[in-house]
């Protein structure tokens, strides 16, 4: 298996006599020794005529792509300028800036902070960025600063550019063609880059670069750009800028069977749910200016699987498909950002004091060792001896295992209910005791009946867990319910010493303010019952005592109160969620019945048949606290036709039609 997280290398940095940062990998300066900030304004902002373009921009988001993030100075400068624009033109159509950048050798947060000290005017944004800056694997990582979105694609740009995929085709408004000079970094400045740039750029989109090298000019012209020269910055005689012709042909869709549609003009959105999955869809949609109504069938929010008193938040690391690992790590990092944003606004119990993974048998120990070889990041996952793990846990354990220091726990019910209440102050409308049934699409809206009244919305999002399969449109989605019961026990003098979540073939949380712990959880597949089970209650405690059999602190637990929370999780066999536009299974299985031969013969393939204006996020299983923030952001970005914070290969893994498309791609028949 590929060691996916070990492929990222950090920059070797030094400073020259002018205190300008220098890359030792490329033996080149990061920006002009004369004035790096003025160079950024002149070359990239003026070169792309950003201020003028923003004033006449006719959609809500503007997308800039940059070929080398470096010190982040270009980002800070353009983000600051965009904030000025929003202040000066509050009624402008343009509301959000997306800055997409690539970086093969990232600087550390400490190095960035040191360099940024020279630019105190950017102190606030720099502090926000460096606080959550933690490159740990290749691929996209989204950083979110209110109306400004920064997507940094770590790793080799020529590997990452194709992963922007179909959803970025013809989407980029302006390029900052930066990076080290062509003679220092010839691997970047080549035809592959220029062709990718051309297909990703909007008709009429522009680029600007500090160089005037003839190889660059000819390369850009050869793929279709109109290239022009202007005076260079400082001592440079010339620089290049240019545009993609307005009449350029749009690049073909590479994966039509995973095609999804956006709805930029639709503003009125209904979300069906009430738990953590729907929460983050709602949050991201509101941030993107949409009018959102939440419909919940219960008389209160977070009544199902999101209603536990305590739940762990940590990435699911496994020795399975490396794309799954990348997905869960990206989710975890984004979830930490979201928690940091929400924490000052909502009152909920939480403690990011780590999660201990206990090696309760040889098989588990070997699995943890394999994961450690794959991650190679002690801030994410670190093997521990028995003594080290005992210190982390706060109680003695006979075996070692692993520790995830940035992980922890929170109260899902407090978090979900509290954040929904906060979002109501931001325009969210919540309708309880309302079960959406048999929605039908006509005249550009989804309609359904409830208590003799008709309800209508332009877009319908289903984030309703295991009850998704009750909708006729969800035919073919292989979702199944998993009943889970979490036991609640009073604390003991020993358990009060527990410092972090302990995971084994179950989990135990530290003491809550109510002086209780949660022990979870039973796992009963194809069962949607929510009654209390005394058998499962005893099994939860027994599993703890059996897995940590030599630990006397697991004894003496009082389970006589029979306190527990039952929930039904929505799961999928391949253990990754689904997110995207709702596929029309009955049409697609006919549409693609000969897909294998069509691709083999290089014949044209139709775009996938989906239900118009209908979207879904589901299958989060027991990882909703970790995955829901990024999934919600992805779905909102798709709906709004804005950049997605995920690589195309992972997007395909998450596609709602993936199960039957996989079969059809192999030439198998789908019934």
Swiss-Prot record:
- Transmembrane stretches in the record are none
User: What's in the keyword line of the UniProt record?
Assistant: Cytoplasm, FAD, Flavoprotein, Methyltransferase, Multifunctional enzyme, Oxidoreductase, S-adenosyl-L-methionine, Transferase, tRNA processing
One of the GO biological process terms = tRNA wobble uridine modification
| Catalyzed reactions per annotation | 5-aminomethyl-2-thiouridine(34) in tRNA + S-adenosyl-L-methionine = 5-methylaminomethyl-2-thiouridine(34) in tRNA + S-adenosyl-L-homocysteine + H(+)
Kindly list the places in or outside the cell where this protein is found, as annotated in its UniProt entry: Cytoplasm
Q: Might you give the EC number(s) for this enzyme?
A: 2.1.1.61, 1.5.-.-
Q: Where is this region: tRNA (mnm(5)s(2)U34)-methyltransferase?
A: 1-245
GO MF, any single term: flavin adenine dinucleotide binding
Protein's UniProt keywords contain Signal: no
Region FAD-dependent cmnm(5)s(2)U34 oxidoreductase, annotated ranges: 272-671
Keyword S-adenosyl-L-methionine applies: yes
GO cellular component, alphabetical, reads:
cytoplasm
Identify which cofactors the protein needs according to its UniProt entry. Answer: FAD
- Which NCBIfam families does the record cross-reference, listed alphabetically? MnmC_Cterm, PRK01747.1-2, PRK01747.1-5, tRNA_MNMC2
Q: What does this protein do?
A: Catalyzes the last two steps in the biosynthesis of 5-methylaminomethyl-2-thiouridine (mnm(5)s(2)U) at the wobble position (U34) in tRNA. Catalyzes the FAD-dependent demodification of cmnm(5)s(2)U34 to nm(5)s(2)U34, followed by the transfer of a methyl group from S-adenosyl-L-methionine to nm(5)s(2)U34, to form mnm(5)s(2)U34.
Protein family according to the UniProt entry:
In the N-terminal section; belongs to the methyltransferase superfamily. tRNA (mnm(5)s(2)U34)-methyltransferase family. In the C-terminal section; belongs to the DAO family.
Protein name, per record = tRNA 5-methylaminomethyl-2-thiouridine biosynthesis bifunctional protein MnmC
Organism field: Actinobacillus pleuropneumoniae serotype 5b (strain L20)
Its lineage opens with: Bacteria, Pseudomonadati, Pseudomonadota, Gammaproteobacteria, Pasteurellales
């Amino acid at each position: 298996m590929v060691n996916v997280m070990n492929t990222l290398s950090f920059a070797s940095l030094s400073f020259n006599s002018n205190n300008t940062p220098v890359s030792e990998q490329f033996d080149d300066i990061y920006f002009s020794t004369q004035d790096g900030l003025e160079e950024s304004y002149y070359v990239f902002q003026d070169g792309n005529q950003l201020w003028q373009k923003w004033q006449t921009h006719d959609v809500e988001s503007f997308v800039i792509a940059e070929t080398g993030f470096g010190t982040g100075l270009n980002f800070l400068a353009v983000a600051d300028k965009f904030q000025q624009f929003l202040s000066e033109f509050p009624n402008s159509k343009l509301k959000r800036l997306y800055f997409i950048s690539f970086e093969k050798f990232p600087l550390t947060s400490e190095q960035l902070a040191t360099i940024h000290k020279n630019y105190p005017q950017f102190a606030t944004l720099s502090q926000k960025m460096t606080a959550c800056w933690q490159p740990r694997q290749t691929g996209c990582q989204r950083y979110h600063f209110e109306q400004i979105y920064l997507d940094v694609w770590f790793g080799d740009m020529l590997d990452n550019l194709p992963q922007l995929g179909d959803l970025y085709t013809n989407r980029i408004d302006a390029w900052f063609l930066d990076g080290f000079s062509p003679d220092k970094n010839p691997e970047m400045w080549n035809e592959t880059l220029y062709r990718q740039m051309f297909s990703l750029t909007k008709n009429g989109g522009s680029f600007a670069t500090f160089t005037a090298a003839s190889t660059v000019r000819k390369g850009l012209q050869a793929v279709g750009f109109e290239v022009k020269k202007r005076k260079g910055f400082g001592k440079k005689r010339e620089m290049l800028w240019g545009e993609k012709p307005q009449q350029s042909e749009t690049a073909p869709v590479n994966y039509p069977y995973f095609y999804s549609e956006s709805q930029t003009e639709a503003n009125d959105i209904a979300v069906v749910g009430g738990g953590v999955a729907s929460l983050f869809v709602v949050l991201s949609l509101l941030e993107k200016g949409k009018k959102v109504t939440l419909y919940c069938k219960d008389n209160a929010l977070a009544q199902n699987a999101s209603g536990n008193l305590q739940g762990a938040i940590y990435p699911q690391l496994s020795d399975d498909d490396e794309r799954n690992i990348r997905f869960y790590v990206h989710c975890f990092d984004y979830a930490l950002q979201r928690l940091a944003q929400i924490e000052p606004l909502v009152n909920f119990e939480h403690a990011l004091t780590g999660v201990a993974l206990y090696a309760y048998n040889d098989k588990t120990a070997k699995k943890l060792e394999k994961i450690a070889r794959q991650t190679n990041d002690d801030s994410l996952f670190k093997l521990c001896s028995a003594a080290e793990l005992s210190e982390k846990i706060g109680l003695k354990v006979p075996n070692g295992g692993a520790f995830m220091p940035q992980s922890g726990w929170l109260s899902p019910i407090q978090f979900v209910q509290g954040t929904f209440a906060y979002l109501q102050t931001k325009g969210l409308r919540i309708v309880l005791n309302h079960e959406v049934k048999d929605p039908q699409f006509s005249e550009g809206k989804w309609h359904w009946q409830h208590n003799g009244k008709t309800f209508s919305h332009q877009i319908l999002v289903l984030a309703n867990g295991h009850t998704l399969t009750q909708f006729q449109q969800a035919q073919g989605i292989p979702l199944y319910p998993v009943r889970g019961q979490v036991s609640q026990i009073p604390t003991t003098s020993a358990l009060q010493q527990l410092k972090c979540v302990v995971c084994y073939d179950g989990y135990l949380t530290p003491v809550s303010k109510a002086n209780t712990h949660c022990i979870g959880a039973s796992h009963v597949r194809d069962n949607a019952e929510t009654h209390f089970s005394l058998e499962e209650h005893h099994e939860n405690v027994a599993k703890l005592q059996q897995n940590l059999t030599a630990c006397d602190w697991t004894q003496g637990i009082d389970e006589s109160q029979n306190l527990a929370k039952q929930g039904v999780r929505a799961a999928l066999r391949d253990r990754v969620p689904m997110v995207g536009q709702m596929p029309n299974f009955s049409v697609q299985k006919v549409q693609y019945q000969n897909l294998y031969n069509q691709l083999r013969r290089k014949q044209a393939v139709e775009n996938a048949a989906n239900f118009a204006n209908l979207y879904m996020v589901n299958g989060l299983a027991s990882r909703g606290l970790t995955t829901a923030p990024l999934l919600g952001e992805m779905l909102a970005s798709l709906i709004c036709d804005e950049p997605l914070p995920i690589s195309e290969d992972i997007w395909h893994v998450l596609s709602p039609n993936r199960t039957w498309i996989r079969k059809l791609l192999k030439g198998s028949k789908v019934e």
